[in-house]
Amino acid sequence: LVTLRYDVTPELFLYLFFICILYLISITDIYDQMIPDSALLIAVIVRLLWFFVTEPFGWRGLLGLIGNGLSVSLPLLLLVLLMEKIRDMEMMGGGDIKLLFVMGLYIGWANNLLALFLGCLTAIIYGSLKQRKEGKEVYIPFGPFLSLGAVFALLIGDGLIQWYLSLFI
């Protein structure tokens, strides 16, 4: 599907790498309840190297790239810290916030916001069904749902966002 969306272009290889990282993160989160910092760091390094090789925009472009990473992850981090202080319990793991930063580097802020929405929606549906089946509170690893949202946003996010905005313009 990614090849159909991006054809055989240099970006295809970047996005295939990104999907492999998301797969690794998802499997690790499912089995170990953690998102490995090493996978996130490798993804950041590859994306920065890709930027410096392919983007001629210099510092302004680099600030835009970093802004894409921070635009969703930083406000969510602040919200999570506030909610954890109010509720006195862990609301979301730090790996999920870092994953959102990395996702923003690859798919941009708008698609990252879409991926977060889709990740939350699918996690809520899955968690509700699992809790109903088991009859008790259940642990839901969020990384796989964020990854699913990121792949969906990578494939059709731009078109979906354009369509949504056209409803208001």
Question: Language model features by range: what are they?
Answer:
Residues 1-9, 166-169:
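N-terminal transmembrane signal-anchor/hairpin module of polytopic inner-membrane proteins
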Residues 94-95, 130-152:
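Interfacial loop-to-transmembrane junctions
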Residues 148-169:
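C-terminal domain-closing interface element
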Residues 14-124, 163-169:
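Functional transmembrane core segments of multi-pass inner-membrane proteins
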Residues 119, 124, 128-132, 151-158:
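Hydrophobic alpha-helical segments
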